């Protein structure tokens, strides 16, 4: 049973992530449970700047940016699960394993980002992420993020 659910709109996402256009890849958070999971949305628009070159006549959302969107969702879950960081600390993307791409993501798609907390040890947290479009898996990966002083 979900006991601590919430919706975070873009204004709240901007408070949690340092990313900004054109690299902010989470539009809103549909729900989450602290220390457990988070579900977010990325609305894929033809106006995304990378579609001009990836690929002309057959625009496909770059796989590395699907992974980045999942990593940003992971960062939000980490922030919401642990509360405030110490001054000068950030969560940094630390590792990715077993990334698999199952279907292309195209303009007009709505990508659902599901990330799940697996475990945390000494400031390093492991997560599993899945991106879906129309309930079809587009990508899955295991990820880690680390709480560290700002560089």
Swiss-Prot record:
- Name a single GO biological process: lipid A biosynthetic process
Q: Which reaction does it catalyse?
A: a (3R)-hydroxyacyl-[ACP] = a (2E)-enoyl-[ACP] + H2O
**Annotated localization:** Cytoplasm
Q: Has the keyword Heme been applied to this entry? A: no
Of the GO CC terms on this record, one is: membrane
Q: Where is the active site?
A: 54
Q: Report the enzyme's class at the first EC level.
A: lyase
EC annotation from Swiss-Prot or TrEMBL: 4.2.1.59
Entry-linked InterPro entries: FabA_FabZ, FabZ, HotDog_dom_sf
Provide this UniProt record's keywords sorted from A to Z. Answer: Cytoplasm, Lipid A biosynthesis, Lipid biosynthesis, Lipid metabolism, Lyase
Q: Is the keyword Phosphoprotein assigned to this protein?
A: no
Q: Name one Pfam family in it.
A: FabA
SUPFAM superfamilies associated with the record: Thioesterase/thiol ester dehydrase-isomerase
Molecular functions (GO terms): (3R)-hydroxyacyl-[acyl-carrier-protein] dehydratase activity
Its biological purpose is as follows: Involved in unsaturated fatty acids biosynthesis. Catalyzes the dehydration of short chain beta-hydroxyacyl-ACPs and long chain saturated and unsaturated beta-hydroxyacyl-ACPs.
Sequence similarity: Belongs to the thioester dehydratase family. FabZ subfamily.
Name the HAMAP family for this protein.
FabZ
Its name, as the record gives it, is: 3-hydroxyacyl-[acyl-carrier-protein] dehydratase FabZ
Q: Which gene encodes it?
A: fabZ
């Amino acid at each position: 049973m979900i006991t601590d659910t919430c919706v975070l709109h873009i204004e709240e996402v901007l408070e949690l992530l340092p990313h900004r256009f054109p690299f902010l890849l989470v539009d809103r958070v549909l729900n989450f449970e602290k220390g457990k999971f988070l579900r977010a949305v990325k609305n894929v628009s033809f106006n995304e700047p990378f579609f001009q070159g990836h690929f002309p006549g057959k625009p496909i959302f770059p796989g590395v940016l699907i992974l980045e969107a999942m990593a940003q969702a992971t960062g939000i879950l980490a922030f919401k699960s642990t509360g405030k960081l110490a001054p000068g600390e950030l969560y940094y993307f630390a590792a990715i394993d077993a990334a698999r791409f199952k279907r292309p993501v195209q303009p007009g798609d709505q990508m659902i980002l599901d990330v799940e907390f697996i475990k945390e040890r000494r400031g390093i947290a492991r997560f599993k992420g899945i991106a879906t479009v129309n309930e079809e898996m587009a990508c899955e990966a295991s990820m880690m993020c680390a709480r560290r002083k700002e560089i």
